[in-house]
Amino acid sequence: DMGGHAFTRAEDNPKKVERSLRIMDLALDLGSSVVTTHIGVVPADPAHPRYAVMQEACRAMGEYGDKVGCRFAIETGPEKAVTLRAFLDSLGCRSMCVNLDPANLAMVAGDDPVAAVKTLAPYIVHTHAKDGRMITYHDPEIIYDFFADGGIGDLRLEDCFQELPLGQGVVPWGEYLAALRGIGYDGYLTIEREVGPDPAADIAMAVNFLKEKLA
């Protein structure tokens, strides 16, 4: 993850893109053909000035990925699946793909993770197994600026959303996993637990939860 404002600022992108290309090289040296990261908030309107800035950066990384055989997977979250799908379609690169995080879609974008699987199907190469719920909707631009700048005024993240152990949030795991199977996805369900008093116990529970769901 490039941190800061990801790939949303033209003046920062040459250095960040170059570093990302080297990260892809390193991943291949380590035997991995997928790199995942956040790219920033994709505007819903293609006419937004930031859209072209992000296109240029992602197209450069995608074209390099096509050349060397490494896929660059954008983690879902700040924008709805239909917006991300349109953005990816506009790039024309096989290697710009998706790391589907169902909890981010539900917690931040207020999107349906099951429908997102179908919308993003051609691009999904990796997934996170994470759960949570939205408490109050807030503009994802504000939330992701908090992560970039470390300040969110009088708003607290715990007032926006809550990450929860698997099965305790709003992700409909039966339907979600069935949707992944339906598009032929047989890759990783990478458990992600970033908060809570005992993340290790939550991860162990998540392993058993997924085993039961996949049985």
Regions found by a protein language model. Name each.
Residues G4-V98, M107:
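Active-site acidic/histidine proton-transfer and metal-coordination neighborhood
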Residues G31, R59, K67, A81-A215:
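Histidine-acidic metal/acid-base catalytic patches
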